[in-house]
């Protein structure tokens, strides 16, 4: 069924026309309990969604849309191990990685909880040895640096988490990440580490990913130029992979290969052995606490009524703006410097999941799907793109994320940060009218002629929606909950848009073409196999390598 032709969708189209002229400033003035009506408190987290262009009827219609999309059945099917990733014939069970032990679940004859428990125990034993100093390098020194080599979900998740939880690391081990095929990335990391005390974690499910394998071979060559003996590789390299043969060929001891499964997608994999670098940096107990936080959000998502369900509410608000206001963009603004990698992580989670143009039946969709996700930490973002948020021609919904406790209580820093966060959401909601701008200019002693010239530039339309997420603090548990919340938000939107949120065919074409172009770059023959633009670019590169400048 095309949900855009459903009764709920039609009702929302009509309702949008009803609320179009309503201003949130007036909604707050007419309802002093608006915050109470549109906020949820849960387990150390507060979601305030009262600063949205909604009323109780809006939310009722959006929840009905979710019901007509069979959201509850889809959610239950995912947790039960149904193969909802139908284009790859796979279950979607990242949630099983953090479930409480003692449940029963089989997928293709595999005992899922037993498999997960086995890998967690392997991770704990390995982590305890490395962190405790029992694991020694080839000269007998303990490990002081871990270099994670991966890309996409094998990089973005662990990198974001280790940055977010840096205050919880004891400093015994530093962690570094290499992802980009640009040789600068691996070169700069290798400058900062010592072969005698560095452990490389190669994160690649197939152990064939071009970027990861190229970077890994460079790291291997760098290591052997110092350690000499290939037998030493086993002391300094571990793998997160399913390809035992390739891992052994590389020189890695299979005892130090950590497996995961095809029912764990890359962008949902930080909870698996892909999170090994997290455990090595923070300790295994912190990694388990991250899992517990995610599990708590899983249970909330499964058990809370749709009307009080945090991921569902966030997803429905996104659908409201994306599909009924034609707003294809959503900003994420963490007011915490440790969360500076969260927007990049959410870009992949959301855009790779729901950036789809065909529905589950293979039909081209007739409505917008995944939005553009972007953002920067506050207050940096205020001095970069908030001009557009406040006075641009359209509006962009935004999530403001703020921990109430700072890990670095210095002077008034945190109070100023908090004041800015709250002020921005109020300003985006309220705006400033022409009369208010005129009064402000008059109070500043501006003459009438100048005032008439300036007033239009001083007007803020307001009525620009935001969600505010307050957390007691960012710690492993709350971060786990926050990440799982966004995972489930993306899932809900995928169900409503009727797309497969768990494949990513869109990354394949460019990779295929790159394989064809690579030998052409290294050939002596001028390229003529492509369109005029691509041929010219290839030949420009070849000419440059032969000594000719581009321009």
From Swiss-Prot:
Its recorded reaction(s) are: alpha-D-glucose 6-phosphate = beta-D-fructose 6-phosphate
An example Gene Ontology biological process: glycolytic process
Question: One MF term in GO for this entry?
Answer: monosaccharide binding
Q: Please give the InterPro entries that the UniProt record associates with this protein.
A: G6P_Isomerase, G6P_Isomerase_C, Phosphoglucose_isomerase_CS, SIS_dom_sf, SIS_PGI_1, SIS_PGI_2
* Keywords from the UniProt entry: Cytoplasm, Gluconeogenesis, Glycolysis, Isomerase
Pathway terms, separated by semicolons: Carbohydrate biosynthesis; gluconeogenesis; Carbohydrate degradation; glycolysis; D-glyceraldehyde 3-phosphate and glycerone phosphate from D-glucose: step 2/4
Q: Name the Pfam families for this protein.
A: PGI
Instruction: Report the HAMAP family cross-referenced here.
Output: G6P_isomerase
Which catalytic residues are annotated?
Answer: 352 (proton donor), 383, 511
Q: Which family does it belong to?
A: Belongs to the GPI family.
- Protein task: Catalyzes the reversible isomerization of glucose-6-phosphate to fructose-6-phosphate.
Q: What is this protein called?
A: Glucose-6-phosphate isomerase
Instruction: Give the species.
Output: Chlorobium luteolum (strain DSM 273 / BCRC 81028 / 2530) (Pelodictyon luteolum)
Question: Per the UniProt record, which EC number(s) apply here?
Answer: 5.3.1.9
């Amino acid at each position: 069924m095309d949900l855009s032709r459903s009764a709920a969708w039609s009702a929302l189209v009509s309702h949008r026309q009803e609320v179009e002229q309503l201003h949130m400033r007036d909604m707050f003035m007419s309802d002093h309990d608006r915050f109470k009506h549109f906020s949820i408190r849960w387990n150390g987290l507060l979601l305030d969604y009262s600063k949205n262009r909604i009323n109780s009827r809006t939310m009722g219609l959006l929840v009905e849309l979710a019901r007509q999309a069979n959201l509850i059945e889809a959610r239950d099917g995912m947790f039960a191990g149904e193969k909802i990733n139908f284009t790859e014939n796979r279950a979607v069970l990242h949630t099983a990685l953090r479930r409480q032990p003692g449940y029963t679940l089989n997928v293709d004859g595999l005992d899922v909880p037993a498999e997960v428990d086995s890998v967690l125990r392997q991770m704990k034993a390995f982590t305890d040895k490395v962190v405790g100093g029992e694991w020694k390098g080839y000269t007998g020194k303990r490990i002081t640096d871990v270099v994670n080599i991966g890309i996409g979900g094998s990089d973005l998740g662990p990198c974001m988490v280790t940055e977010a939880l840096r205050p919880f690391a004891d400093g015994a081990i530093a962690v570094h990440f290499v992802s980009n095929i640009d040789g600068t990335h691996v070169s700069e990391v290798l400058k900062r580490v010592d072969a005698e005390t560095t452990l490389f974690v190669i994160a690649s499910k197939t152990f064939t990913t071009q970027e990861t394998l190229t970077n890994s071979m460079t790291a291997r060559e760098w290591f052997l130029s110092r350690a000499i003996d290939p037998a030493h590789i086993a002391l300094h390299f571990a793998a997160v992979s399913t390809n035992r043969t390739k891992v052994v060929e590389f020189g890695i001891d299979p005892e130090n290969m950590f497996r995961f499964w095809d029912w764990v997608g890359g962008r949902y994999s930080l909870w698996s052995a892909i999170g090994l670098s997290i455990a090595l940096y923070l300790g295994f107990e912190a990694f388990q606490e991250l899992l517990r936080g995610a599990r708590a959000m899983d249970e909330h998502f499964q058990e809370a009524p749709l009307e009080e369900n945090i991921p569902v509410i966030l997803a429905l608000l996104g659908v409201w703006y994306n599909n009924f206001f034609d707003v294809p963009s959503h900003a994420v603004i963490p007011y915490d410097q440790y969360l500076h990698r969260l927007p990049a992580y959410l870009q992949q989670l959301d855009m790779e999941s729901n950036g789809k143009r065909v529905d589950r039946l293979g039909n081209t969709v007739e409505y917008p799907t995944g939005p553009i996700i972007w953002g920067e930490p506050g207050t940096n973002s205020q001095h970069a793109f908030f001009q557009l948020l406040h006075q641009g021609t359209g509006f962009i919904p935004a999530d403001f994320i703020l921990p109430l406790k700072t890990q670095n209580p210095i002077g008034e820093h945190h109070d100023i940060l908090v004041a800015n966060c709250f002020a921005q959401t109020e300003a985006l909601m309220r705006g400033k009218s022409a009369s208010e701008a005129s009064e402000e200019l008059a109070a500043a002693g501006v003459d009438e002629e100048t005032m008439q010239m300036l007033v239009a530039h001083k007007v803020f339309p307001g009525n620009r929606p935001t969600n505010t997420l307050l957390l007691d603090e960012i710690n492993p548990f709350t971060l786990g909950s926050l990440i799982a919340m966004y995972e489930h938000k993306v899932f809900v939107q995928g169900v409503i848009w009727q797309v497969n949120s768990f494949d990513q065919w869109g990354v394949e074409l460019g990779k295929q073409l790159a394989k064809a172009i690579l030998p052409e770059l290294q050939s002596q023959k001028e390229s003529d196999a492509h369109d005029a633009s691509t041929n010219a670019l290839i030949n420009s590169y070849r000419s440059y390598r032969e000594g000719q400048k581009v321009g």
